[in-house]
């Protein structure tokens, strides 16, 4: 919330509020893009899938491979052209604006439909992220799911409305560094715990990346296909703009 107040006074134009005036540091922008993408699903959803499902570990590994490829090609193919053409196409500061200006639409149909699609599907996506945060707070602090959900919604909404794009990117930066540290530290603790437990090591040894019963070639293709989502996620594409 304090970050929101800090950047509230630094936003002087509509472009500053919505897109940070296109002047965000490259490290802040890139880490923000990855942190906003690798949100609750990376630290809670994907490990949970790997733990609960029979072929979950194999599924999670192939999904991670697909997402890594999707992230790489999204930055390689989309990032620079999108930044360039959003400026050329009427200095567009939102995805709906860019689509309308890029294709020289005389009506607002393209803008309205793209905005509606983003609103509908991102409401579902955002709700799942709030649910993940609420579950985490409830588990760590024991305050109950509903109070944790309300707290998450209030805090995120407050700094977003106050500071706009800059506040979101800087909070994403801190969260991204925290997530990166967790990804490094947690496996180290897991390894330390597993060294004295042969049962878990034997179970890990059963994980295979090949075609197996319950997880065939179609499952592998479906898992890798998750990476295709990167090319159309507006919260990531906005960072490129």
Predicted features, each with a name:
Residues 1-45, 160-163, 176, 182-188:
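Membrane-interface "cap" regions at the ends of multi-pass membrane proteins
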């Amino acid at each position: 919330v304090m970050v929101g107040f800090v950047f509230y006074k630094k936003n002087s134009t509509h472009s500053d509020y919505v897109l940070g005036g296109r002047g965000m540091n490259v490290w802040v922008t890139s880490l923000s893009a990855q942190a906003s993408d690798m949100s609750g699903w990376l630290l809670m959803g994907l490990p949970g899938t790997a733990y609960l499902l029979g072929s979950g570990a194999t599924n999670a590994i192939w999904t991670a491979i697909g997402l890594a490829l999707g992230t790489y090609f999204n930055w390689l193919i989309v990032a620079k052209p999108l930044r360039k053409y959003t400026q050329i196409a009427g200095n567009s500061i939102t995805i709906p604006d860019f689509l309308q200006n890029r294709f020289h639409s005389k009506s607002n149909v393209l803008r309205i439909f793209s905005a509606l699609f983003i609103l509908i599907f991102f409401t579902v996506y955002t709700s799942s992220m709030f649910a993940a945060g609420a579950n985490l707070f409830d588990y760590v602090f024991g305050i109950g799911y509903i109070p944790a959900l309300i707290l998450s919604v209030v805090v995120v909404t407050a700094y977003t409305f106050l500071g706009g794009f800059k506040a979101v990117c800087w909070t994403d930066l801190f969260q991204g560094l925290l997530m990166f540290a967790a990804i490094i530290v947690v496996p180290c603790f897991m390894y330390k715990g597993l060294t004295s437990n042969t049962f878990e090591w034997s179970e890990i040894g059963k994980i295979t990346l090949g075609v197996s019963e319950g997880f065939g070639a179609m499952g592998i293709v479906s898992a890798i296909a998750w990476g295709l989502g990167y090319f159309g996620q507006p919260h990531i594409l906005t960072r490129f703009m």
